[in-house]
Amino acid sequence: MSQVSRPRLAYPLIALTAVAGLAVLLGVHWAPLTRFDSALSERARTFGHAHPIWVGTLRVVTDAGATMVFLAAGTALAVVLLWLRRYADSAAIALCTVAVPAGWLAFHAWLPRPRPVAGFVTVDSNGFPSGHSAHAAAAGLIAVLLLWPRLRRTGRVVAVVAAVAAAAVVGVSRVALLTHWPSDVVGGWLLGFALASLCVAAVGMVQSCARWRSSGTADPT
């Protein structure tokens, strides 16, 4: 893409492999992972009951990763970039806005995964992976890639730290509110990163192919 940095293709493929592996472990009810999820969730439950203000705050914070917020923000950004004639960037954002929710919804339909019982927020659907966490990771990565060519070293570090922190806060909120197990959140982060990266890479490849064909047509020989 002309104005958005493209991530290396190996990274999202590794992330997708990790998501698939995690899904398999959950599907076979791997005991160490189950114990880890249960132990961390019970600590979150105990802490939440003892600190109701913490729970109330996270109920607001967690909405930053909600599906409607992600769809609205992605659509708005794609339209703005289209208006600025940054067509490839707009296409990548639009593709990501569709692909990430579709990705976690596909996992929800495929893998039966009950959520923690008696959570502070009740959600009636399968839990792996966390859609909120996937949205936060994807949005953070897209923001970093958009800003990367325009920032110097310090600015890039700040952008990466801010993106990671935002995704972490949303993910932690899902565990703390007992709407997801910790492994659901990890799966969401990995899926969001992978799909956003692949969307950017796919549009970049199409753009490169178009340029190659154009240059070949223009060649008088």
Residue ranges and their predicted role:
Residues 1-69, 110-119:
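N-terminal transmembrane-helix/juxtamembrane module of multi-pass inner/ER membrane proteins
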Residues 7-16, 73-100:
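Interfacial segments of alpha-helical transmembrane regions
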Residues 22-23, 98-105, 165-175:
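Aromatic-anchored segments of alpha-helical transmembrane domains
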Residues 41, 45, 104-112, 144, ...:
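Membrane-water interface at transmembrane helix exits
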Residues 53, 85-90, 117, 153-158:
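Membrane-helix interface segments
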Residues 88-121:
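Hydrophobic alpha-helical transmembrane segments of integral membrane proteins
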